[in-house]
């Protein structure tokens, strides 16, 4: 007997246990024609397991968010050295691989999260138990053409200066902005959702000003096509390292972007 989530990986139905758990909890897995929503459910080799969802393009749905940014903002990562901050299971890393990045440093404070196939890929360096704020001390001679970030439980203000320090001149950055980790706990509603439109506008302007202060030009800002796990509206911001002496490029259409992003029920305040 073995756990259902483990067996999904063994049978090549899911690429990782994290993805297997998601399939199961989303009600997409049947055992002997019975829907099972418990990852720890025990099955035998003779049990018939069926997955009823669509094939995943990336190991995590974050890959679809980065794919959207790459297509929308016309970003080219081919043959570039990239850094994925907060790699987790590797959705962003997988997307970079499929877009022909030369080498990807997948960094995360956790461990045993990155998809096994990504760990085996010679173009991926799996750097676990590492805070990006300590990265420069550990790898003092490395700089990056492209940096992407999808982090939780920490404000982007806590890590951006370290990312900029690692970025080559005229290097590119894509950040996924998650409002629930930027507005303060007192402004978070039920299930961790930030519904107040004014808070979205304020935090975006605040971050943009901060990014400019650190030497980044704001090229594009767009709502993510996929909401966060709790239903939060998220944003993708594309930036470049400013060339010394040039006037900073900023972004003034935040209200329009937020209105575009939020559903009518989210715009009530």
Model features per residue range: what roles?
Residues 105-158:
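S-adenosyl-L-methionine
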